């Protein structure tokens, strides 16, 4: 279980202090699929980075399975089973996709077939990618899918995905949502997905709308989705439909 208690994040700007995250408290039970959504600049990514340890909060406490992890490093959190997928994943010149999957799996010895299976789950033809370097020759969407495959290979207990649909074509997007659904059905991990996409939002056990650094709405899909649509129709583009996705 993940517990955020009165999390705040403040930065200094030329105009003075600015609160990016304002006293957010939320508990996420094990094996839930949570979607964080809301307007751009509302604080979703910052909150996710705080959970992973990429950003240190200026106030509050983070508990994971009852342990205070607020001061732990990224590496220490990763060892506890927390994984993070970036909006814009890094590239690794000289490291092949196969190498990256083996590194992600850690002590688990992945067979070539297992590596191929992870790539297939994110909509990539394994034979075309396994021996390619994760460098500038790959598109942003390709690197994004490879990163998601490495997260799957880690078998983390808490998986955080920041806009996993970004730069991904419709066919691969469909495969990706199927993968999220399967992980959720298996009940092996808690997922936090930052997304504006209707199809991903509707997978959620709970939707959390974050705006202006605060939780604006939280509840089931049936409760919150109509509010998102109302905001959208009212001129606040909280939700974007992925054209062609059904």
Where are the language model's segments positioned?
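The feature captures the beta-strand-to-loop junction immediately N-terminal to the Walker
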Residues: 37-39
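Helix-to-loop junction immediately C-terminal to a conserved catalytic motif
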Residues: 52
């Amino acid at each position: 279980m993940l517990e955020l208690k009165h999390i705040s994040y403040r930065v200094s700007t030329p105009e003075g202090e600015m609160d990016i995250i304002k006293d957010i408290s939320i508990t996420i039970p094990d094996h839930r699929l949570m979607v964080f959504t809301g307007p751009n600049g509302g604080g979703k990514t910052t909150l996710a980075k705080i959970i992973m340890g990429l950003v240190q909060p200026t106030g509050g406490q983070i508990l994971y399975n009852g342990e205070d992890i607020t001061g732990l490093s990224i590496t220490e959190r990763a060892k506890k089973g927390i994984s993070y997928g970036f909006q814009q994943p890094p590239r690794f010149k000289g490291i092949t996709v196969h190498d990256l999957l083996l590194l992600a799996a850690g002590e688990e010895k992945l067979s070539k077939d297992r590596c191929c299976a992870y790539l297939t789950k994110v909509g990539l033809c394994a034979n075309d990618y396994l021996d390619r370097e994760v460098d500038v020759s790959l598109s942003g969407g390709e690197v994004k899918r490879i990163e998601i495959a490495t997260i799957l290979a880690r078998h983390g207990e808490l998986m955080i995905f920041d806009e996993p649909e970004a730069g991904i074509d419709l066919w691969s997007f469909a495969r990706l949502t199927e993968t999220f659904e399967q992980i959720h059905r298996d009940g092996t991990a808690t997922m936090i997905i930052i997304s504006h996409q209707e199809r991903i939002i509707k997978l959620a056990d709970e939707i959390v709308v974050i705006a202006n650094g605060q939780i604006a709405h939280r509840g089931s899909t049936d409760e919150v989705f109509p509010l998102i649509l109302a905001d959208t129709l009212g001129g606040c583009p909280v939700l974007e439909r992925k054209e062609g996705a059904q």
